[in-house]
Swiss-Prot record:
Belongs to the PPR family. P subfamily. It holds the Pfam family PPR_2. It comes from Arabidopsis thaliana (Mouse-ear cress). It comes from the Eukaryota. The gene is EMB976. PPR repeats lie at residues 187-221, 222-256, 257-291, 292-326, 327-361, 362-396, 397-431, 432-466, 467-501, 502-535, 536-570, 601-631, 634-668, 669-699, 703-737, 738-772, 773-807, 808-842, 843-877, 878-912, 913-947, 948-982, 983-1017. One of its GO terms (molecular function) is mRNA binding. Residues 50-69 have a biased composition (Basic and acidic residues). Keywords: Repeat. The keyword Repeat applies. Residues 23-38 have a biased composition (Low complexity). This is Pentatricopeptide repeat-containing protein At5g27270. One of its GO terms (cellular component) is chloroplast stroma.
Length: 1038
């Protein structure tokens, strides 16, 4: 209101004595005039002069305060109360210290206010009227209750009493009594008070009647009264009445305040009447009412909700230009609007501006920005924003978590996506189908179709209804694992939700094509055409591929016509190429028409060639090929068509096209020739491969790819000499066939025992500085190791090291074997140390290799230590490793360690098989540990392991060599006792032993006793026996 009186008054509250606020600096030291001692009185109170309550006595009495000190204390208390009142806001309960004229002071004393805001009679009247609210309605008459206040209350006092009421009935009754008083005079002020109180409790009908009464008594409503009425309508959602009343106010040219407009705008926006908010805002601007921060917040939000981007940004800019700092919700509105409008740079700029203001974004704003970063594939920014959310403790809802799962999936962080999904489930935030499907798609993209289907199954068990999109994802899963039945079931379920989309139809058609289900594919195309599914270009391509593969010329022609009529695809290169190449021979000037096509589609040409080849129409095929070679794309298009046939496994068509091209005298590209040669090599068609190779060499020198494929074909067909010759020839010409081809060739030569040729290739690679990769160097080193060329292997390794090619674990393992075989144990140890420092995972193979060379070098402590280290690192030795350890320990006469190793094998589930004990017997025999060898044979027999000639032959041979013929004879007899018939080798060995020892007679006796009856025409045994008889001068008895 404009009244000075009402603006100078505040709400009535009971008198409350506030406690003093303690302060460290609140105590004031007052010096006495006669002493330097300090006292600390209460600075906020003065003596009331009451002799019955004297001040406390002190040791040293205080002198009376001077006038200056009294004024200073009064001012201090005034400042304190002023500060307290400001801190309490509009509900301040402390009296206001004001300056009064002498006349006002006289009136103040007459009112007997005693420091209160109103006089005692006014306070009493307020309490009396308020007290009526506790009585039953109609039980008391206001005239009777207020009879004691007649002629005591001025008009202003009555307004104060009216203003301080809380119940609408008391307001109504008191206002009626007030109008009967002599001091009453009709005023817009008093009517405004009544309107405000009625409006607060929703008595709109009574407010309207009061407003009409105000007009009838001749009071012209001002801006405050009209604003009060408008706020009442707005508060209680009477928008139609509010806008009607607002039009009436405009007609009276009453200028409303900003707060009234804000009230109306806020009320309209709460009910989502954003169009009316905008209209009211424009009228507000037209009236020249200055908006404040809250006004702009409402208007920007309504513009954003209506999708008016330019207007919202303009209002937002005006808001900032006036010095207002937008709230987070305002920034969020314009950011979201910019993202929806596709103005991504503006959205990012607004977000960065908001962050520069120190405003922490809400999770809705973060979700909007994450969606933007996801659309623009700016995944690092998205993850950075998510990290900021965690740092600022902004709660991530399910929408945000779903976006992060998708982003993790796009980045290949499948484990992180799974962790986020599980965390969302743990927090009980997992409820939306989109989150489940996001996780399912991540699993699908990672190739884990089973997990993708598990997520969808989880949705079903939790009674989450499957949407159309869920069936699409299910179809993609089943199509990927080629489960036709389930895919068809998912497609039928999708069809029940509406017309299937082109992408899903394409998935089904591709599934039928991959599984060569031609009849199903044709039936499916027919059905979706009947259902009038909207084809996209990809679905058209797949359908055309089916028709061409099945040789359905008529259907293909109809499909081309259909594509040519559709505005969405008729300008596509694929469609244009098909249309132009359908009937080349029968069309006049077809060559010119095709040349007018800016670019031919390779896939379309391949389909047409496929169709004509399937049809057997060679004339059309030749015409298409001739035409393609005359276009701007030249041979590259044809070569890509041939390559596509090879990739799809349709080699016969590729061969046919290649034959036609050669007969027509046209030239294929090297990559295509190399591809076909490789195919011929895999099929062992060396004659055809050589024909293509020679055709390629007629025009120019074959390139690397052709030579590489030809060498590979030679190797596959077993023509290693030709492969070797081609490599050496190409190397002389400076052509490098590549590391892979060299590896294949050297490996093949090594396996066939052609070590000289392998060495020549290795030397050539070093001399010509041919670039090799890790696998290539490994192959050469291994080949030289097997050829026994240890120095060459060492040179290759040094070249590999100086060239900066990284070593693999195979490199280190092979070099340990090279230096170990060359008795260079120190270098082998150095290589093993390099392998440790490389950071590569050391496997059982390299440990076993190093342990073996330690054993051969006599360093058993190092071998045992390394074997223990291998086990500590979690590598469980296999049977070969244990056999090797048993062998080197037995050789070094470490019998205790051998027993422990055998026991460890049994504990770790490594079976001590025939080879284990055979190795042990051979080692014992070779190292002249005959007793241990015999014990081992006995142990094998006790374990029930079947014995063989091999177990005895090595021991028998060692005993014979040592001249221990009696032990040898005993071993021979044990063999017979074990049920093993000695073979010719054992017989020869023991008989030669008798001859060597010069004891021919014993040899003859042993022969006649043990062997003679079992010799079956063995000429080698017979020869030894003949020598025995000659030695004693006897003739052999026949």
């Amino acid at each position: 209101m404009k009244s000075d009186f009402l603006t100078s008054t505040t709400h009535f509250n009971p008198s409350i004595f506030l406690p003093k606020i303690p302060s460290r600096n609140s105590r004031i030291s007052i010096k006495s005039s006669s002493s330097s001692s300090k006292v600390r009185p209460d600075p906020w109170s003065l003596s009331d002069g009451n002799p019955e309550k004297p001040k406390p006595r002190y040791e040293r009495p205080k002198h009376p305060l001077s006038d200056d000190d009294a004024r200073r204390i009064i001012k201090k208390k005034a400042q304190y109360l002023s500060t307290l009142r400001r801190n309490q806001g509009s509900q301040a309960m402390t009296p206001k210290w004001i300056k009064r004229t002498p006349e006002q002071m006289v009136q103040y004393l007459e009112d007997d206010r005693n420091g209160q805001m109103y006089g005692k009679h006014v306070v009493a009247a307020i309490k009396t009227v308020r007290g009526l609210s506790q009585r039953r309605q109609g039980s008391d008459d206001m005239r009777f209750v207020m009879s004691s206040f007649v002629a005591k209350l001025s008009f202003r006092d009555m307004c104060v009493v009216l203003k301080e009421q809380r119940g609408w009935r008391q307001v109504r009754d008191f206002f009626s009594w007030m109008k009967l008083q002599l001091s009453y005079r009709p005023s817009v002020v008093v009517y405004t008070i009544v309107l405000r109180l009625y409006g607060q409790v929703g008595k709109i009908k009574m407010a309207e009647e009061t407003f009409l009464e105000m007009l009838e008594v001749g009071c012209e409503p001002d801006a405050v009264a009209c604003g009060t009425m408008l706020c009442t309508y707005a508060r209680w959602g009477r928008h139609s009445a509010m806008l009607t009343f607002y039009k009436a106010v405009q007609e009276r040219r009453i200028l409303l305040s900003t707060s009234v407009y804000n009230f109306m705008l806020s009320s309209l926006q709460k009910k989502s009447f954003h169009g009316k908010v905008i209209d009211l805002w424009l009228e507000m601007v037209e009236e020249g009412v200055p908006p404040n921060e809250f006004t702009y917040t409402l208007v920007v939000s309504s513009y954003a909700k209506q999708g008016f981007k330019e207007e919202a940004l303009k209002a937002f800019g005006e808001m900032k230009s006036l010095g207002f700092v937008p709230e987070e919700v305002t920034y969020s509105s314009v950011i979201s609007l910019s993202v929806k409008a596709g103005d991504w740079e503006k959205a990012i700029g607004l977000y960065e501006d908001m962050r520069s203001q120190g405003i922490v974004p809400s999770n809705y704003t973060c979700a909007t920005m994450l969606s933007l970063y996801y659309k623009t594939e700016n995944y690092p920014k998205a993850l950075s924003l998510f990290a900021d959310m965690e740092r600022n403790k902004i709660p991530a809802d399910e929408v945000i978590r779903g976006l992060i799962i998708r982003i993790y999936g796009k980045l290949g962080l499948f484990h992180d996506a799974q962790s986020m999904f599980e965390e969302t489930e743990r927090l009980n935030l997992l409820a939306d189908e989109k989150t489940y499907l996001a996780m399912s798609q991540v699993h699908l993209n990672s190739g884990n179709v089973v997990k993708a289907l598990d997520v969808i199954e989880m949705m079903k068990t939790r009674d989450i209804p499957l949407s159309r999109f869920a069936y699409i994802v299910m179809l993609q899963c089943y199509a990927k694992i080629q489960n036709v039945d389930c895919a068809e079931e998912a497609f039928r379920a999708l069809s029940k939700t509406g017309l299937p989309d082109a992408s899903s139809c394409n998935d089904m058609l591709n599934l039928y094509t991959r599984l060569n289900l031609g009849e199903k594919a044709k039936g499916f195309i027919k059905q979706i055409m009947v259902d009038q599914v909207h084809f996209d270009i990809e679905l058209y391509k797949t359908a055309m591929r089916v028709y061409c593969k099945e040789g359905m010329v008529a259907e293909a022609q109809d499909l081309i016509v259909k594509m040519g009529r559709e505005a969405r695809v008729k300008d596509n290169r694929f469609v244009q190429t098909l249309a132009e190449s359908m009937h080349i021979v029968n069309k006049h000037d077809k060559h010119e028409a095709v040349l007018n096509v800016s670019q031919l589609d390779v896939m379309a040409l391949g389909l047409m060639l496929n169709l004509r080849l399937k049809e057997g129409n060679l004339n059309e095929t030749k015409a298409i090929l001739n035409l393609m070679f005359k276009t701007d794309l030249g041979s590259s298009a044809v070569n890509r068509v041939i390559s596509s046939f090879v990739r799809e496994g349709d080699v016969s068509k590729a061969e046919m096209i290649a034959d036609i091209i050669i007969r027509l005298g046209l030239r294929m590209e090297e990559e295509t020739i190399a591809t076909l040669i490789a195919v011929y090599g895999r099929q062992h068609k060396l004659k055809e491969a050589k024909r293509l190779y020679l055709a390629a060499g007629e025009s120019k020198t074959p390139g690397k790819s052709v030579i590489r494929s030809m060498i590979d074909a030679y190797v596959r067909c077993g023509w290693l000499e030709d492969a070797y010759g081609l490599f050496m020839e190409s190397a002389e010409k400076g052509c490098d066939p590549g590391a892979v081809t060299i590896s294949i060739l050297v490996n093949a030569l090594t396996n066939r025992g052609k070590h000289r040729e392998a060495e020549h290739i290795s030397r050539t690679c070093l001399e010509k500085n041919i670039e090799l990769d890790t696998v290539g160097y490994n192959t050469l080193i291994k080949a030289m190791l097997e050829a026994g060329k240890l120095q060459c292997a060492s040179e290759i390794y040094e070249r590999m090291h100086t060239s900066g090619v990284p070593c693999s674990i195979q490199t280190y393992n092979t070099m340990i074997s090279v230096y170990g075989r060359g008795l260079q144990l120190d270098k082998a140890i150095e290589i093993f140390s390099n392998a440790r420092r490389s950071g590569l995972y050391l496997d059982e193979k390299i440990y076993t290799n190093m342990i073996m060379h330690y054993g051969k070098g006599g360093k058993m402590s190092e071998a045992l230590s390394l074997f223990s280290e291998m086990q500590k690192k979690g590598i469980k030795p296999g049977t070969p490793s244990y056999n090797m350890m048993v062998k080197i320990c037995a050789t070094s006469r470490l019998h205790h360690e051998v027993d422990e190793l055998l026991q460890a094998m049994e504990r770790n589930g490594r079976c001590t098989d025939l080879s284990t004990y055979l190795t042990l017997i051979q080692v014992y025999a070779e190292s002249s540990q005959f007793a241990e060898a015999e014990k081992t044979i006995t142990l094998v027999k006790e374990k029930g392991i079947p014995l063989s000639h091999s177990h005895f032959s090595s021991l028998l041979s060692a005993l014979v060599k040592a001249g221990m013929m009696e032990e040898a004879e005993r071993t021979y007899c044990k063999m017979s006792e074990a049920g093993i018939s000695p073979d010719s080798a054992c017989k020869r060995t023991i008989l030669k032993g008798y001859m060597t020892c010069g004891d021919a007679e014993k040899g003859i006796l042993f022969y006649e006793k043990m062997i003679r009856s079992s010799v079956e025409d063995d000429r080698f045994v017979s020869s030894v026996v003949e020598d025995l008889y000659k030695a004693v001068g006897k003739e052999q008895d026949v």
